C-alpha cells in the first residue's frame, strides 16, 4: 500500500509538469498566441494549429488528479468523511479529461465576433459544455480543501487549509463577478488559478510521499503524540494511517 501510494503521488507530480510543458509547447507553436491574453483552452479550439497537444496534456492532467485521489484513500480511511477528498479529486480529473475533446469554436478573448456569438448563445453545444466542464474542474479542486479540512478536523492543519480554501472561495467569486475587468489579461488570470491548483496538488502529493516513506514506528509515535496532544486540549496536525 505504501509503495502504491508513493507511485500514485509521483504520477500526480509528473502530471503537473506535463500540464505546464504542454501549454508552453502548444503556445509556442500557435501563431500569434498570447499566454497573457488568451485562455489555455484556446490552444485546443477549432482551427488551432495543434489542438491534439491540448487534448493530450489536459488529459494527462486529469489522470494525475485521479492518481492523487487513489493515493489519498488509504491515509484518510480512518478519518471522518474519508472519501470526500478523493471523490473531489476524481471529479476534477474526469472533468479535465472530458474538457479536451469538447473544443471551443473560437477565441472569445481575441475575437469580438466570437465574443458576441458566445453571449448570444449561437455557438455549438460543445463550446458551452467546455466552459461549464472547465468550471467543474475549479469548483471540485476548491472543494478538496474543504473536504480535507473536515477529515482532519480539529487539527491546526485543518484550520489552516480551511482558511486558505475560504480565501480562495472569496477570491474566486470576486474574479467571476469582475471577469470582464480582466480584458487583455484573462490568460494570465487563468494561469494564476491553474498555478494555485498545481501547488495544492504538489503539496498533497509531497506529503503523501513523505508519509509513505516514513517507517511505521515513526508514524505510530506521531499518532501517539497527536492523541496525547488532543487529550491535553491542544489540536495537533492530522496524522496519517500507516497502512
Task: Identify the residue ranges that each predicted region occupies.
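Hydrophobic alpha-helical elements and their junctions with loops/disorder across both membrane
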Residues: 107, 212, 228-232
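Hydrophobic, aromatic-enriched alpha-helical segments typical of multi-pass transmembrane helices
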Residues: 2-211
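Short, intrinsically disordered terminal tails adjacent to the first/last structured region
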Residues: 218-243
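Membrane-interface capping segments at transmembrane-helix boundaries
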Residues: 208-221
Amino acid at each position: 500500500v505504501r509503495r502504491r501510494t508513493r507511485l500514485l503521488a509521483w504520477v500526480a507530480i509528473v502530471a503537473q509538469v506535463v500540464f505546464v510543458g504542454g501549454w508552453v509547447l502548444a503556445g509556442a507553436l500557435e501563431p500569434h498566441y498570447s499566454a497573457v491574453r488568451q485562455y489555455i483552452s484556446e490552444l485546443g479550439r477549432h482551427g488551432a494549429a495543434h489542438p491534439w497537444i491540448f487534448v493530450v496534456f489536459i488529459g494527462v492532467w486529469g489522470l494525475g488528479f485521479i492518481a492523487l485521489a487513489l493515493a489519498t484513500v488509504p491515509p484518510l480511511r480512518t478519518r471522518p468523511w474519508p472519501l470526500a477528498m478523493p471523490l473531489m479529486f476524481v471529479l476534477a480529473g474526469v472533468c479535465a479529461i472530458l474538457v479536451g475533446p469538447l473544443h471551443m469554436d473560437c477565441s472569445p478573448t481575441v475575437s469580438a465576433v466570437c465574443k458576441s456569438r458566445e453571449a448570444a448563445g449561437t455557438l455549438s453545444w460543445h463550446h458551452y459544455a467546455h466552459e461549464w466542464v472547465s468550471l467543474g474542474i475549479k469548483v471540485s479542486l476548491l472543494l478538496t480543501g474543504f473536504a480535507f479540512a473536515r477529515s482532519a478536523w480539529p487539527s491546526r492543519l485543518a484550520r489552516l487549509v480551511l482558511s486558505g480554501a475560504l480565501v480562495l472561495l472569496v477570491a474566486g467569486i470576486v474574479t467571476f463577478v469582475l471577469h470582464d475587468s480582466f480584458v487583455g489579461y484573462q490568460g494570465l488570470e487563468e494561469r494564476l488559478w491553474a498555478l494555485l491548483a498545481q501547488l495544492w496538488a504538489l503539496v498533497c502529493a509531497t506529503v503523501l510521499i513523505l508519509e509513505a516513506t516514513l517507517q511505521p514506528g515513526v508514524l505510530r509515535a506521531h499518532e501517539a503524540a497527536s492523541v496525547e496532544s488532543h487529550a491535553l486540549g491542544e489540536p495537533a496536525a492530522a496524522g496519517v494511517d500507516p497502512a
